[in-house]
């Protein structure tokens, strides 16, 4: 089951959080859902070169809050914050409400080579430049290992290297426990448009195990602490002392 279901959807509420946080009635829910889709599509098209790995959306009354996780925050912010104002006006135009309050928070991704989306984006860019897919995967594995990930799995499918028959190939380094719910697994998919057709890319990144109570990720090489087993009490047999 863990190999077929979406890794993030399986772990919602355990190690993963929802990308959209808001509540709506049955009448307004479809409208807000379409707004979220339009906002993410607009940001992906306009700021494709900024390396945005995720867009988190939260709503409070009439206020819209966005959190953008990016590898290059300077591309979005611009000079003296001019890019933020341009992005805000673009979002208001996209949703068709110029009076909507939009708060934007740009967060820089600390470990770029440990992010599944950015790794998939890197692989897609290399494949579109006609770099051999085996060499591209090997370079992505090396970058992820230098970033300190515990495990990585990469899958590429399509007409690899221009072959007439499409096929799927994958490689894995380290551990990628898809059945372990407490495992923090980052998952992303991308498409590479080549002259021979579209190549599909899937990336799984295992970053560690999250303890539910402590909400801490277990560091590299460490094992989760187990409760010490209680030793059984020993009783002496004194039934024959008074006989």
UniProtKB/Swiss-Prot annotation:
Biased composition (Basic and acidic residues): 233-243
Cellular component, GO, one term: cytosolic small ribosomal subunit
SUPFAM superfamilies given in the database record: Prokaryotic type KH domain (KH-domain type II), Ribosomal protein S3 C-terminal domain
Keyword Transmembrane helix tagged: no
Occurrences of domain KH type-2 (ranges): 39-110
Positions of region (Disordered): 216-243
Molecular-function GO term, any one: rRNA binding
InterPro entries xrefs: KH_dom, KH_dom-like_a/b, KH_dom_type_2, KH_sf_prok-type, Ribosomal_S3_C_sf, Ribosomal_uS3_bac-typ, Ribosomal_uS3_C, Ribosomal_uS3_CS
Highest taxon in the source lineage: Bacteria
Keywords for the protein's UniProt record, in alphabetical order: Ribonucleoprotein, Ribosomal protein, RNA-binding, rRNA-binding
Keyword Calcium (UniProt): no
PROSITE patterns in UniProt: KH_TYPE_2, RIBOSOMAL_S3
GO biological process, one term: translation
Subunit structure: Part of the 30S ribosomal subunit. Forms a tight complex with proteins S10 and S14.
Entry function: Binds the lower part of the 30S subunit head. Binds mRNA in the 70S ribosome, positioning it for translation.
HAMAP family membership: Ribosomal_uS3_B
Family of the protein in this entry: Belongs to the universal ribosomal protein uS3 family.
Protein's recorded name: Small ribosomal subunit protein uS3
């Amino acid at each position: 089951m863990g190999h077929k279901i979406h890794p993030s959807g399986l772990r919602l509420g355990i190690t993963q959080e929802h990308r959209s946080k808001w509540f709506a009635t049955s009448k307004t829910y479809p409208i807000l859902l379409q707004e979220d889709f339009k906002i993410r599509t607009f940001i992906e098209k306009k700021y494709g070169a900024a390396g945005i790995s995720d867009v988190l959306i939260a709503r409070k009354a009439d206020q819209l809050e966005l959190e953008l996780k990016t590898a290059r925050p300077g591309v979005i912010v611009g000079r003296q914050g001019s890019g933020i104002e341009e992005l805000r006006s673009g979002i208001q135009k996209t949703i068709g409400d110029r009076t909507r309050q939009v708060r934007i928070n740009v967060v820089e991704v600390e470990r770029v080579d440990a992010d599944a989306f950015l790794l998939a984006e890197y692989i897609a860019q290399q494949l579109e430049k006609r770099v051999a897919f085996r060499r591209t995967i090997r370079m992505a594995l090396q970058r992820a290992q230098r970033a300190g990930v515990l495990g990585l799995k990469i899958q590429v499918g399509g007409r690899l290297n221009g072959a007439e028959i499409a096929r799927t190939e994958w490689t894995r380094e380290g551990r990628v426990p898809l059945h372990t719910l407490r495992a923090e697994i980052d998952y992303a998919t991308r498409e590479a448009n080549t002259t021979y057709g579209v190549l599909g890319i899937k990336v799984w990144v295992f970053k560690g195990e999250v303890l539910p109570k402590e909400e801490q990720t277990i560091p590299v090489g460490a094992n989760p602490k187990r409760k010490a087993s209680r030793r059984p009490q020993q009783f002496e047999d004194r039934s024959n002392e008074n006989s």
